[in-house]
A protein has these predicted regions:
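A general structural signal for short secondary-structure junctions and capping/turn motifs
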Residues: 69-72, 83, 115-118, 152-153, ...
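Short, charged surface segments at domain edges that flank catalytic/cofactor-binding sites
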Residues: 32-78, 102-117, 121, 144
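A boundary/linker detector
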Residues: 1-65, 87, 281-285
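Generic beta-strand structural signal
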Residues: 77, 114, 121-125, 158, ...
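C-terminal, charged low-complexity interaction regions
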Residues: 5, 183-285
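Histidine-centered nuclease catalytic patch
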Residues: 84-129, 133-150
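Long, low-complexity, intrinsically disordered segments enriched in glycines and aromatic residues
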Residues: 141-188
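Acidic, metal/cofactor-coordinating or nucleic-acid-engaging core segments within structured domains
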Residues: 132-137, 141, 167-168, 202-216
Length: 285
C-alpha cells in the first residue's frame, strides 16, 4: 500500500509526472456535474426509488472514470493497495466506501454511501484482483458510528478496510522476507485485525504472483545490503577504488528500488529498516 495525498491534489496540478493538467474550467465542470448527479440521487432517495437511484449511479460510471488517469498518475501508475502495475490485473476506480450497498463481516447488507458515488475523495485505484473480491465489503468496528445521508459522520467511522489516503493506515503495514504483508510490529489488536481483514479481502497475500514479487524485491535489497557491508569493510583500511565503486553502485540501486515510483518500494524500504543499515537508510529518510 502506498500513501496518496489525495486531499491536497487536483487534476489542475501541473507538477504530477505523466499527467497533462486539466484547465480550471474542466475541473469546475466535473465538480458541477457531480453536484447535479448527487442532487438527482437525493431526489430518488427521498422518493423511495432505490433501484432507480442505483441505476443512475451505474449509468454515470464514466464520470468517475474520467479521473482514472489522474488517479493513476498520483501513484506513478501503481495500484494504491498492492503497489504494483501489471501483477494485480487492470485497474478500476474503486469507491472506498461502497456506493450502493455495504456488507459487514458476516455478510449482512446495509445501504451504501450513495451520496459519495461522485465524490472524488472517495475514489481509489485498485487492481481488479482485489477490487472484485472486495465488492461492497465495508465492515465497521463493533460500536462504531455509521454514516448516513441524513447524519453524515464518515470521519467518525471506524472501518476495517485500510485506506491509502490515510498515512496512519499505511503505517500499519509491514512485510516479511517471504513476501507476506503483515501488521507492523507493536500494533494494537484492533490494528492487527484491520490489517488481517484488508489483506484477506483484497487478496494481498493470497495472490501468489504479488507475494512472489515482494519476496524478489526483499531478496534484491537483502543482497545489496550484503554487498554494501562487504565493500564498506574493504574500504575501512584505506583507499580501495573497486570497493568504493561498489558502494556507489549499491547506493544507486537502493535509491532506484526505494523511489516512490518503483513497484513495491514500501517492501524495499521495510527491508532496509529490518536490516538496519544506517548509511543506506539515510538514502530513504
Amino acid at each position: 500500500m502506498i500513501f496518496i495525498d489525495l486531499e491536497h491534489k487536483r487534476p489542475t496540478d501541473n507538477d504530477i509526472p505523466g499527467w497533462t493538467p486539466w484547465t480550471q474550467a474542466q475541473w469546475d465542470g466535473w465538480l458541477a456535474k457531480s453536484a447535479q448527479l448527487v442532487t438527482a440521487l437525493e431526489k430518488l432517495q427521498a422518493a423511495g426509488k432505490r433501484d432507480e437511484r442505483n441505476a443512475l449511479i451505474d449509468a454515470n460510471s464514466a464520470h468517475w472514470g474520467a479521473l482514472k488517469e489522474w488517479l493513476l498518475a498520483l501513484s506513478g501508475g501503481k495500484c494504491w493497495f498492492s503497489e504494483v502495475r501489471d501483477l494485480y490485473s487492470h485497474y478500476d476506480v474503486e469507491h472506498f466506501r461502497p456506493k450502493k450497498q455495504a456488507k459487514t463481516l458476516d455478510g449482512t447488507e446495509r445501504d451504501g454511501y450513495w451520496w459519495l458515488a461522485f465524490d472524488y475523495m472517495n475514489f481509489r485505484v485498485c487492481g481488479n484482483v482485489g477490487n472484485r473480491k472486495k465488492g461492497g465489503w465495508f465492515p465497521l468496528q463493533q460500536g462504531s458510528l455509521c454514516s448516513t445521508f441524513d447524519a453524515r459522520c464518515e470521519e467518525s467511522e471506524a472501518p476495517y478496510l485500510l485506506d491509502p489516503i490515510d498515512d496512519d493506515d499505511v503505517s500499519l503495514i509491514a512485510f516479511d522476507e517471504e513476501g507476506k504483508l503483515i501488521p507492523m510490529p507493536g500494533s494494537s489488536l484492533w490494528e492487527q485485525e484491520r490489517v488481517s481483514e484488508t489483506v484477506k479481502r483484497l487478496k494481498l497475500n493470497e495472490h501468489v504472483p504479488l507475494a512472489e514479487a515482494r519476496r524478489s524485491v526483499w531478496q534484491k535489497v537483502d543482497a545489496l545490503i550484503e554487498d554494501f557491508q562487504a565493500a564498506k569493510a574493504k574500504c575501512a583500511g584505506g583507499k580501495n577504488p573497486a570497493a568504493k565503486a561498489k558502494l556507489l553502485e549499491v547506493r544507486a540501486k537502493v535509491r532506484e528500488l526505494t523511489h516512490r515510483s518503483a513497484e513495491l518500494s514500501s517492501v524495499a524500504r521495510w527491508c532496509l529498516q529490518v536490516r538496519n543499515e544506517p548509511q543506506l537508510l539515510k538514502l530513504v529518510a
